[in-house]
Amino acid sequence: MAKKQRYNTTQRKELRKKEVDYIKELETKIDEYDASINKPVFFKDLPISNSTLKGLNDSAFLKLTDIQRDSIPMSLKGYDILGAAKTGSGKTLAFLIPVLEKLYRERWTEFDGLGALIISPTRELAMQIYEVLLKIGTSTSFSAGLVIGGKDVKFEMERISKINILIGTPGRILQHMDQAIGLNTSNLQMLVLDEADRCLDMGFKKTLDAIVSNLPPTRQTLLFSATQSQSLEDLARLSLTDYKTIGNPDILNPSNGKVLGPSTPETLQQSYINVELPDKLDMLYSFIKSHLKSKMIVFLSSSKQVHFVYETFRKMQPGISLMHLHGRQKQKARTETLDKFNRAQHVCLFATDVVARGIDFPAIDWVVQVDCPEDVDTYIHRVGRCARYGKQGKSMIMLTPQEEEGFLKRLASRKIEPSKLTIKQSKKKSIKPQLQSLLFKDPELKYLGQKAFISYIRSVFIQKDKEVFKFEELPTDEFANSLGLPGAPKIKMKGTKSVEQIKQMKNASRQLLSLAKTNEDGELVEEKSKQPVRTKYDKMFERKNQTVLSEHYLNITKAQAQEDEDDDFISIKRTDHALNEEELPQLSLPSSRRAQKRALSKKASLSTKGNATRVVFDDDGAAHPVYELQGEEDFIKAGAAEDQKLEYLQKEKDVMNEVDVEDKQVAKQKKQEKKRKRLEAIRREMEADMDNESSGEEKVPFLGTGNLSDDMQDPDSDDEEGSRLRKRSRFETNNNYNDNDSDDGVIQVEEPQTLEDLESLTARLIDN
């Protein structure tokens, strides 16, 4: 390994001076650069540093896209950017390159604190941005960090003070701002919001406002998304006054309010099919069966639907790998699923909108939307998972007759016109019988189907666009049957929150919510329990099952016909209460101790009760004694005694004949087994004889057996060592294989090996 070159003080001063001169020259090029005149095509045509350019070349990023060509020069000059471009157009590099260049020109070090903050609405998108930054920043000396939910907070807090570029989700970033001691944002140079319209909506409003309040107003702000917002209120929250709008073919022009162009890629083939709600799963299964050599993403509206469709389709085995991804999974499972899906060639991923924004999946062939999205922006982000970077892609959305007219009108307002597909009858396949069979056999799967039904109905109920989502026209009974359920579960819509309220509660900080329960001193006040202290027996009787026998499961499985109107506020509940002594029976107690002892004695009680009688029960449940004597009248009705005797003998003979056949088979099997064992013993004896004859051959060593001294012995002493280790027979002496007879009359012979040896030994004994 080559030694690191060391410089003296003079050389270091010269290097620093060269770097300062190079940065000044670079800033001069940036000020004089005009993209409209130069029209750059490659990254090397831009006024960026050599270290950033080297990282781009090593990562095979050579050619500029439209959004990069228009936004990077403006970002380098220090303008605030409101960037919008079609999905898959390279927006990530459009803000990562200015971040690296800004910190490089400022000569940023780890002692300067946090220099750039990049906020992403989802964990998966934040991880993707972090991976791209690691690729293009290999030649720089900046430190980068990723903070997302599902990771160890203490581990992040210990290292966040040395981070120059921080990437994360809004909730975790705000948590570190409140708790991490070493996080200093006073010197922040750049703030980047990826998928800015999602970060600025109601779900992250309070969190983002709290983050922005901790940042200096002199920062540079970059906003990027495929569906950008120009709301003056949102821009004022981020202190955007003098900003540049870049790459805006899909943004509403603030002057005339007209759409300037479609926001989906030209290489994307968009289509839709008109299908009834109860037939959606049949259509989805038929589509998957006819596209087994494809890589597709199937979007559904809720995590419970994703889980139900994945579990049922997995049991039916359509012939393609199936995966599922939703926000209720653990972070480790989500990361592993994304990694497997990216590496797979032919696979189907059932997912919610957690992966609808920004995630760059390689080589997606189809994007299928089973449920209608809440708005056109969600539709654009979903279909944007395919046809990225100029590649081909296809998308299909399933619209019910109630949704078709209204949603197509919304798409036409954004110049999106999908073509209508007609499915061949030969390609359609009904899976309702299979679903009913699966749910009948598996109660937990049935419970999952009921929750999927409820989640879909509620998702339609809370939508704001009532022209598209017509709740009153939903065929609930038919939809429940299509899921394999015997009937539609009971749903309570009272007090259902809106979409904005649900998003706000989902993204709210748990620690901020806990502050509402604190007193003036900041101590957490626990509510006093009004119930008395419960014993372990009370807890045992109050214990309830948490699976399919839970209270929630029993509530949704009740038949609506059996429920009364009063069930909403009156229900039977087990309680412990005092018993009325007047209703208790008066039992006579023994007066003397001898009587009490006799009453408790089992032997004494049996003497008065008599012997136990054994009974048997027939098919009708009636009890009979084991042995019943036939009466005289019944015996006469059965016929003559000789006839009954012959009938009984014939019956027993038939039974014996049947048993005799079985006994013969058992005897035959035992005989064959005995013969097999005898032949096996003969074979083992023959193998042992062959081993003794070939004892002079070289031994095969085995690892881990024997002694080290055995492995190191002299080859010439094999026979002697073998004879020493071998157990001697009763007619062998210390002098092995000695043919001479001793003086005491004992015949000493070799060990008999064959039948001839035994015959010769017998003859010698007779002669003696």
Swiss-Prot record:
A motif (Q motif) lies at residues 41-69. Its EC number is 3.6.4.13. One of its GO terms (molecular function) is ATP hydrolysis activity. SUPFAM superfamilies: P-loop containing nucleoside triphosphate hydrolases. Its main location: nucleus. Disulfide bonds: none annotated. Residues 280-439 form the Helicase C-terminal domain. Residues 653-666 have a biased composition (Basic and acidic residues). ATP-dependent RNA helicase required for ribosome biogenesis. Involved in the release of U14 snoRNA in pre-ribosomal complexes. Required for pre-rRNA cleavage at site A2. PANTHER family: RNA HELICASE. This is ATP-dependent RNA helicase DBP4. It comes from Vanderwaltozyma polyspora (strain ATCC 22028 / DSM 70294 / BCRC 21397 / CBS 2163 / NBRC 10782 / NRRL Y-8283 / UCD 57-17) (Kluyveromyces polysporus). The gene is DBP4.
